[in-house]
Amino acid sequence: MIFSVDVMGFENDIREAINACRDFCKKNSDVKIILVGDKERIQKEIKSSDNFEIVHASEEIKMTDDPISIRKKTNSSMYKAIELVKENKADGVLSAGNTSCYVFLTFLILGKIPGITKCGFMPYMPTINGRGVNFLDVGANKECDATDLVNFARMGSIYIEKVRNVKNPKVGILNIGTEDNKGLSYHIEANKILKDVKNINYVGFVESRYLLEEKVDLIVSDGFVGNIALKALEGTFKTVLRSLLGTRKKPLFGWLWFLLSIPNLLTIKNKYDYKNNAGAIVLGLNKIAIKTHGSADYKQFYSSLRLLRDTVKADLINILKREFEKDNEGQ
């Protein structure tokens, strides 16, 4: 397996990405990594024992860039890393750069699988009992129709079954209530369609209060609502953790409680730490594209490389292509 990794344009030092790539290759002898970025800066960080290929990129997409302005940045590290996958010189791509630009360029360069109306941005979130849940879409599309939501359910179900090895994954649509008449017209229409799809384990609407309670394995939403829900969860977790840590500033009993709670606090922190399960797939593309956090460190790059490896190994793209070819055959 060959992966192209964009090591530029994110908020951390490039050594975080390079060190993660080095250690990942040591533990995965069947993986080769192409580092894409400023050759001079990369060479300062690599060791003589490293077996990396370097593709020089003279440009860098900044976090402040917008998708329209980067069309002509064909010499940027992000563009070149994605292009390597299109040219079949790599099996998948990973970047921690500007999210909106990355999603735009993957659409532009790699294209969609025939039959798929919209691609979606899908992360993984840990849940109470450790099973976890995927969330599609969380920002690639501000607006969706019923067909898009149905396709998200189909793609996400296949991904969870083939990559996460969850049999017969449960699927739900994020909504303001569980009754069939709740939500906007496209929610109601998608709900009706999915109830009749035999190869999807659809359980109906899911309210946001149950996102982390393992009622489903896949939450389906348009990207606008999905992004708000995801960021609300992230913010809530940080606030609760900060509040718990704040008890140590209180009198003796506060300190005593804090000291006794340290093991439990660490367990909770490790369980819900997104760094352990970093990386989101742009699902629906002709190739594998993974995006990690803009402030990614060693841990996040490493876990994102693991996701990239597992997705490529599962032969996900060919499975999705075969699934959506059936739609064309039926027309």
UniProtKB/Swiss-Prot annotation:
Keywords, comma-separated and alphabetical: Cytoplasm, Lipid biosynthesis, Lipid metabolism, Phospholipid biosynthesis, Phospholipid metabolism, Transferase
Pathway: Lipid metabolism; phospholipid metabolism
Cysteine disulfide partners in this protein: none
Location(s) in or outside the cell: Cytoplasm
InterPro entries in UniProt: FA_synthesis (IPR003664), Phospholipid_synth_PlsX-like (IPR012281)
Molecular functions per Gene Ontology: phosphate:acyl-[acyl carrier protein] acyltransferase activity
Principal subcellular localization: cytoplasm
GO cellular component: cytoplasm
EC number per UniProt: 2.3.1.274
Keyword field contains Lipid biosynthesis: yes
Catalyzed reactions per annotation: a fatty acyl-[ACP] + phosphate = an acyl phosphate + holo-[ACP]
GO process terms (BP): fatty acid biosynthetic process; phospholipid biosynthetic process
Top-level lineage group: Bacteria
Stored SUPFAM superfamilies: Isocitrate/Isopropylmalate dehydrogenase-like
PANTHER family for this protein: FATTY ACID/PHOSPHOLIPID SYNTHESIS PROTEIN PLSX, PHOSPHATE ACYLTRANSFERASE
Oligomer and partners: Homodimer. Probably interacts with PlsY.
NCBIfam families: plsX
Similarity remark: Belongs to the PlsX family.
Free-text function comment from the UniProt entry: Catalyzes the reversible formation of acyl-phosphate (acyl-PO(4)) from acyl-[acyl-carrier-protein] (acyl-ACP). This enzyme utilizes acyl-ACP as fatty acyl donor, but not acyl-CoA.
Entry-linked HAMAP family: PlsX
Protein name: Phosphate acyltransferase
Organism expressing this protein natively: Malacoplasma penetrans (strain HF-2)
The encoding gene: plsX
